[in-house]
Amino acid sequence: MDRIRRAIVGGHPLLYVQSWEESRVERLAQHLAKTFYGTPVPLGIWSVVDGLVVDGVPAPDTRDPVKALEAILHAQGRGFYVLKDFPTGAGRPETTRRLRDLYRGLKDRGRHVLLVSPRLLLPEEAKKEIFVVEYELPDEGEILRILEGHMKKRGGQALDDTASKRMALALRGLTADEIGHVVAKVFAQRTALDEEAFQEILAEKEQMSKKEGVLEFVPPRFSIEDIGGYDTLKGWLKKRQALFSKEALDAGIPIPKGLLLMGISGCGKSLAVKTISTLWNLPLFRLDMNAVFGTDNPESTFLRALRSVEAVSPAVLWIDEIEMGVGGYKEGGDASMSRIFSGFLTWMQEKSALVFVAATANRIHLLPAEIIRKGRFDQVFFVDLPNEEERKQIFQIHLKRNRCDPARFDLVFLSKATKGWNGAEIEQAVVSAAVDSYAEKRAVTEEDLHRVIAATVPLSVTMEEQIKAIKSWAHDRALNASKN
């Protein structure tokens, strides 16, 4: 609202308001028409269905965009005009010409036109005449007013300050209409605010992410206890657990930007990312770069995906195998990849939304230096093959998951027998033993595990040279995720 008001004060007659919220922009225009010039001035609303309607009175023969612009140009006195989904794209030379004429005709006359659309489609010829404003989604104050209005309407008891502010934080990223729908659902069958209410808000944000097509909502299934080892990483995450809270925001504590997990395949990088959303109680969205590059305009799709995840913030954005997608740029390579890479770096550096980026990488030698330099991510972690103690923990986790009592197994022996194994290989050994024993209608024994272990050649043997190279590369470039 402030940017629109400042643009009008600055004398801009043509404003392009990029927003999904036509009703909210229209309410703002109503407020401006009543108050901006001290006395009320006319308010016109145009759509291709109704044409131009000024203060409730239809202007004849104005459904055609050019004729609507002519009517605004020849109107008398000051006024505000909201044009919904006005066709400003390429292929409309007569509309473009009339817009440029309108700019000169309305300048310094107190008449202002607000072109409203969720997509930014500006003709090249008119870019200098049109002032672009990305209308921000409701902030905390506006969300609290919507909440208060709903509670009064239904005659319910007002929420206390703590509950209201937590609710406002959870509702960030939704439009005013979406907030109204969610609040109505949440309080339809309850009088108090409970954890289930916040799960409903999470479900609404999941629904929003599906509309973009390249963001996948990842439900919170794993906890930090499901990871064996990674003590340094776990400590880092726990220390930042409360930084997305209302209290931390009010205290001015810097919000974490993100982390990069790189290292050997099969060591649990993806699992570690999935536990962040559970630990921090934030929704997790995975950006599917294959889907991005499968569209007609990968650059536009990628930038829309970033805006979409900002819209559902606070959230965690997971970029898997970043070296093959965003970080796959090479100098002199594909121009679209270059623009995506540049756009991502700029977004990481300047983003103000509450989005934590969790990226993983296997082929770390492919990562451009710009990705791993300080300032992009808060920390770069190297994930190595698990040590003996960590392998014991991993065996415990997967034995329990397969309904086996770890106390019945010699975990020390199993850990020593699987030296050089990664977490995925240990998991598969336990699963294979469970399948074999089930086929024979009996419980899993340690001998089952011994047999599977003896028949397995781990990745550390088949790819010994590559793993040595990965370790050497990461030695001075990243912090080990484990203490040992």
Please provide the spans of the model-predicted regions.
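Glycine-rich P-loop/Walker A and Walker A-like loops and their local beta1-loop-alpha1 context
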Residues: 1-35, 89-93, 270
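Walker A/P-loop NTP-binding motif of AAA+ ATPase domains
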Residues: 15, 40-114, 118-122, 127-131, ...
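Interdomain "pre-motor" coupling segment immediately N-terminal to P-loop NTPase/helicase cores
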Residues: 165-217
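Amphipathic alpha-helical coiled-coil
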Residues: 11-16, 24-28, 36-50, 108-112, ...
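Conserved phosphate/pyrophosphate-binding and hydrolysis machinery centered on Walker-type P-loop NTPases
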Residues: 11, 18-23, 89-93, 157-161, ...
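C-terminal engagement/docking regions of AAA+ P-loop ATPases
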Residues: 1-10, 26, 207-275, 307, ...
